From Swiss-Prot:
It comes from the Eukaryota. Its main location: nucleus. GO terms for cellular component: 90S preribosome; nucleolus. Residues 202-309 form a coiled coil. GO terms for biological process: maturation of SSU-rRNA from tricistronic rRNA transcript (SSU-rRNA, 5.8S rRNA, LSU-rRNA). Component of the 90S pre-ribosome involved in the maturation of rRNAs. Required for early cleavages of the pre-RNAs in the 40S ribosomal subunit maturation pathway. This is rRNA biogenesis protein RRP36. Pfam families: RRP36.
Length: 316
């Protein structure tokens, strides 16, 4: 029993159909052929009851090769009748799918990278950035509690030649620098209120000295020495400032008494204030300490003079 493939035929209008008559003829012919083959006989008079398998396989292979060769030109004819609009739509859909797959792969890579960075930060102990508080988080706990408002404001992209006049009700107020809340800053009052911090600084300096003495790491010791030197210089500057203010206060007190006696007021200049400050400073020193201070000052002045001299006049 032989089989044959049904091939579509393409007409001029592009519509394909199958030949039913040919199929029927082929089927009838195949049946008749089978009967002839079954009742066939050889030349020598001997009869046989079936086809030989080898001849049947060869016929099938030959028919398959012929049908493939016939289908190729038919497929090309069918493709030639496809409109350009259909081809363009197919091409767009292919490009869209390719872009979508690329964007998905890129998005997956970004999420994986972010997850790796977050895990690395957690392993190193780095705290994540604080996110901006939402409106629900900024709500007050009670109506008597102060309202919390974000200080972050977007910077305008437009250049403002003249600053706009903002009403007092809409102007932002920082309570740290608001005179209505804190009042006017007075350095004397501030120093008096926070004078207890000087005792804390003295304790810190003592602890630093002990740590420098016990430390065996040279790099750490140098860092602690720099910190201690900075604290000592700051304390010395504050003491000199307080001493200068004390000299000015005493001078003003004497001048007030002289004004009451009918004399004209005398106002100290900066140079006179420095002289009075040095005189009071040297009066508290003994002879040896005074000689050391004067010797240091002499050396300092000589070095300044040498720096101001031309190179040709500098000697040894």
């Amino acid at each position: 029993m032989s089989f044959r493939r049904i091939k579509p035929f393409v007409d001029d209008d592009g519509s394909g159909h199958c030949g039913q008559e040919n199929v029927m003829n082929d089927s009838v012919g195949s049946r008749g052929g089978n009967k002839a083959e079954i009742s066939g006989s050889n030349d020598d008079g001997t009869t046989w009851g079936g086809n030989e398998p080898e001849d049947g396989d060869d016929d099938m292979d030959m028919e398959g090769e012929e049908s493939d060769e016939e289908e190729r030109p038919n497929a090309q004819v069918a493709i030639s009748h496809i409109s350009f609009g259909t081809l363009a739509k197919a091409q767009k859909s292919i490009v869209r799918e390719r872009q979508r797959s690329q964007s998905l792969s890129k998005r997956d890579w970004v999420t994986d990278t972010k997850a790796q960075l977050a895990a690395l930060k957690e392993s190193q102990g780095i705290k994540p950035l604080k996110l901006q508080k939402t409106r629900e988080e900024l709500k007050r706990s009670s109506k008597h509690a102060p309202q919390e408002i974000s200080s972050k404001r977007a910077v305008t992209r437009r250049r403002e030649a003249v600053a706009p006049i903002i009403p007092a009700a809409q102007a932002a107020r920082d309570p740290r620098f608001d005179t209505a809340v804190k009042g006017v800053y007075d350095e004397k009052v501030f120093r008096k209120n926070y004078s207890f911090l000087d005792d804390y600084r003295e304790d810190e300096m003592k602890a630093l000295k002990q740590e420098i003495f016990k430390s065996k790491d040279e790099q750490k010791r140098e860092q602690l020495k720099k910190e201690l030197l900075s604290m000592e210089s700051r304390r010395k500057t504050e003491k000199n400032k307080e001493q200068g203010e004390k000299v000015v206060r005493e001078h003003r007190k004497r001048e007030r008494e002289l004004i009451k006696q009918g004399k004209k007021p005398f106002y100290l200049k900066k140079a006179e204030q420095k002289k009075l400050l040095l005189a009071e400073k040297y009066s508290k020193l003994n002879e040896k300490q005074l000689e050391k201070v004067l010797e240091k000052k002499r050396k300092r002045n000589s070095q300044k003079e040498r720096k101001s001299m031309p190179l040709s006049r500098r000697v040894g």
